[in-house]
Amino acid sequence: HVRANGALVLARNADEATVLQEFADTRLKQEGYRADLLSARDVAGLYDGQLAHHCMGLRGHDDLQIYSREALPAITRYLAEALGVTFITGTLARAVENGLVGTTAGDFQGKHVFVCPGHDYLTLLPERFAPLNLEITRLQMLRAAFETNPVALDRPLLTGLSCVHYGAFSDLPSAHALRDVIQARTPMLLENGIHLLISPTPYGELIIGDSHRYGQDAFPFNDEAVDNAMLDLASQALGARLRVVERWQGVYGAHGPAPFSVMPVDAATTVAVMHSGVGMTVGLAIGERTVAGAIG
C-alpha cells in the first residue's frame, strides 16, 4: 500500500512560518523541490477547516508513504514467490571473507557478498565500523486513534518542529532562530530530540513520533513524559483528542561521518550500512547503486 499524496508541513506560529517562508524563497527554488507554500487561508481550506489554527503550510508533492509493518513482509513475499529469492531466517552470520559466509546454518559461498547489518556494528567486521564512531538512536513511537474530531488525513503531517531536525531546513538562519525559541519555551523537546511526525495508517489510525536518545546501546526504558509530549503535540496539531493504542521503540544507527557508508572489504565483500534516519527513504537506491557498482 503506497500513498503518493505528498506531505504537509504546518507552521504553528510566526517563528515556524518564517522558516517555511525562507525555505520557499531560497532552497525550494534552488533545489527544484516540487512544493507549494500555503497561506493561512489555504490551510484553513484543507480537511474541512480542521487545521485552520495554523498560520502557514508547505505542501510537498513527491513524498511517498508506506505502511511499513505490512509493506516489508509483502516485499519479502514478492522476492520469494516472484523472483525465487531464498531467505534463511533464524540464522546468525558469524564470519565473512572472500565470498565465504560462515553461519549457524552452515557455510555459503557467493560470487560477491553484501553485508547489511543494520545497527549491529559488533557481530561482523567490527574493525571496519570502529573508526566511524557510530552510535545508536532509540525512538519512542505511538499508534493512536481519534476519540473526537477525526481528520481524514491522507498524507504525513509535520510541524515547524521538524524544521530544526531535518537538514533541508535546519541550517537556514530562520531555523537557528526557531531552535533558540524552542530552547527558551520548551527545552524538553530539544533535550529529548522530539519533533512531530504524524502518518495515517490505512485503517484510520495515526503513527506518531518521534523522540531521539543516542548512545552505544538502545536504552530499554521509555519515558512517559516523552510519550505525553508527543501525544499533546499531535492533539494540538489536529485539533482532536487522541487515544494511544500501541507503543514501541524504533532503533537505528546514528552519527558517523555521513548518512551512510559503503565500504569494500575485499574483492568479494562489500559492507553497506545506514547510520541516519533516512534508510526507508534512500535505502533501496543505495542497494541498487552498491550492487551495480560491485557486480555490474
Identify the residue ranges that each predicted region occupies.
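Glycine-rich nucleotide phosphate-binding loop and flanking beta-alpha elements
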Residues: E16, D120-L122, Y214
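Helical element adjacent to the flavin cofactor pocket in flavoenzyme catalytic cores
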Residues: G57-H112, C116-P117
